[in-house]
């Protein structure tokens, strides 16, 4: 069976009259652009209009459909029961014919909160009412009106009955120790969930999107009144700063801070998705929170309110690719090394993995190289292998005991039918400690392509135009002192700007 790789769709706008088939199509096209094969309609919003499902049918996007209940408990009075029964019947009958409809889900996070008996639960009857709504009324209606479609009682859930709904070994899991729990990105590697249906990390939207709600220079600060009003999780701008100080040097300008925040988000989700794809079979779903925004805000989305793509969305295009190479490196980040301890020693190694989410076996070549900051090759390796359909395959560990963690990095690439189809780089130290050389980035436009050149290792190269609405075949990519041709999908190619992690200083 196919691994589910997707994220969650929330209402497209706080003013619903602005939403129409054109806006929905543009958003779902962005989902397909990033190689999604499914999408979750989150239960804290509303049931989308028919055109949403028509477009998903057309695009081949499987829909996980929540019923519209989330993060609350309800008193099941006779009047309320009659109301919701009609709601369930009408929506099941309205949507059941869609080829894209893959699953009905009772609610978002309610079983978990009832199980934990948290402060939202005020009286015992609410537990009884929960069972009646989500384990009797809804499944009976789904069985009667849409018996072909699977019903799942809640997300997360282990199958219902308040049986440890967030159990990592059963059902689906919402995992937030990274972000809410302030754990490092490498924490994902400690877990082997069966289906991770929600996890996320915040980032600022594009500067041009921020300028839609303020053009006052004094507001261009993560802790200004305006920025904190456009942040709906209390103190989360400080949380972004906390992760940033662990990872990067202090940005010298607000636009550089925005860029760094987007790289944090992109790398945080990448760590998770790549780990779970490497463990395909044990884990069959990686669903990050969230696709879109309903207003211009600092949030978990990969597409901001104005439709601009954050770095995460380009990363998603790569880590959701049907054929993908990834690297499980061991170094300073994975060991959580404390440089002030007497024994500041840790393993320096890589384990490469190829994930094949296609229906055919793939004959591929894997190449890796240990390089210095100028991208000169110090050591290299190559291996040919066949990766069976719908599997992931590990390569042997390679150790680098003599590597300089501050000056050496590893590049890797996956070649299929003579073309590089997936690639990346890893460091053994935090980016803030790596001795990047100035890559002296340049670019030129040739027809519908931008050719980007670097004279040294360039990490997470960003290409922006003046309006920051340029959509490219690839962006926020790594260069090994070489050049890359990037196809322009839309947007002006005048007044292009380039930067990389070297510029976070």
Regions found by a protein language model. Name each.
Residues 1-2, 6-72, 81-103, 231-266:
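Active-site-adjacent substrate/metal-binding segments within catalytic domains
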Residues 58, 74-164, 306-307, 311:
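Active-site neighborhood of glycoside hydrolase catalytic domains
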Residues 104, 140-143, 152-362:
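Substrate-binding clefts and catalytic carboxylate motifs of secreted carbohydrate-active enzymes
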Residues 350-356, 412, 448-454:
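Buried hydrophobic-core signal for structured, non-transmembrane domains
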Residues 358-376, 455-471:
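Short acidic, flexible loop segments centered on an aromatic residue
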Residues 369-408, 468-493:
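Intrinsically disordered, low-complexity Pro/Gly/Ser/Thr-rich segments with frequent PxxP/GP/PP motifs
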Residues 394-439, 492-505:
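Terminal connector regions
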Residues 437-481, 485-489, 501:
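C-terminal accessory/binding modules appended to enzymatic or scaffolding proteins
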